[in-house]
Amino acid sequence: LHIHESTSDTTPAEVARVLAEVREEAGEPPLVMVDYLQKVPLDERGGDEVARVTVVTETLKDMALELECPVVCISAADRESLGAGHRMRTRDLRGSSALAYEADLVLILSSKENIVSREHLVYDLGSVQRFRRWAVITVEKNRHGLGHVELEVEKDFEHGRFHPQARVVTERLIEERIFTT
């Protein structure tokens, strides 16, 4: 196991160099975790955030393809999307157009009590407490499989984890169509 912690000054070019070294030493592609995407600096300064996120996203995608390694990025969200009654979607991620295009997989993690439809809350006041124990993982995009899947996992934050057994969400969530054609 090789863990390389970088600072906020580590550019994509430096990340690529370290990844090539790790791959050479280990003989297998490394797993790359970027926390978080909008903080990755570029060699050149300037440009708005969308342009910077686009360059970083494209660079990381090229790196993943060249080194044949998975890259997992955590992304910041727009402040407006964090308000009550709003369900986060890919479009709410900062620099979302590049993320929506380049990413093979986009997952959104939400607390269930924040995104379950009101109908499940008003008639059963105890349901709020039950829903607080769960998180919903929404598969917003999956280039190589099913997309628009909602799974729920039980929180086990005492142990810093989620329970490994996920299940499909059965309740209606906010911002879902009531009728489908």
Predicted segments, located by residue:
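Helical hairpin unit composed of two closely spaced alpha helices linked by a short loop
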Residues: P30-P70
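Conserved H-loop
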Residues: I74-A76
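Flexible beta-alpha connector loops of hexameric P-loop NTPases
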Residues: H2-D9, P41-T54, S81-R91
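C-terminal regions of RecA-like/P-loop NTPase motor modules
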Residues: P12-V32, T59, L65-L67, E80-T181
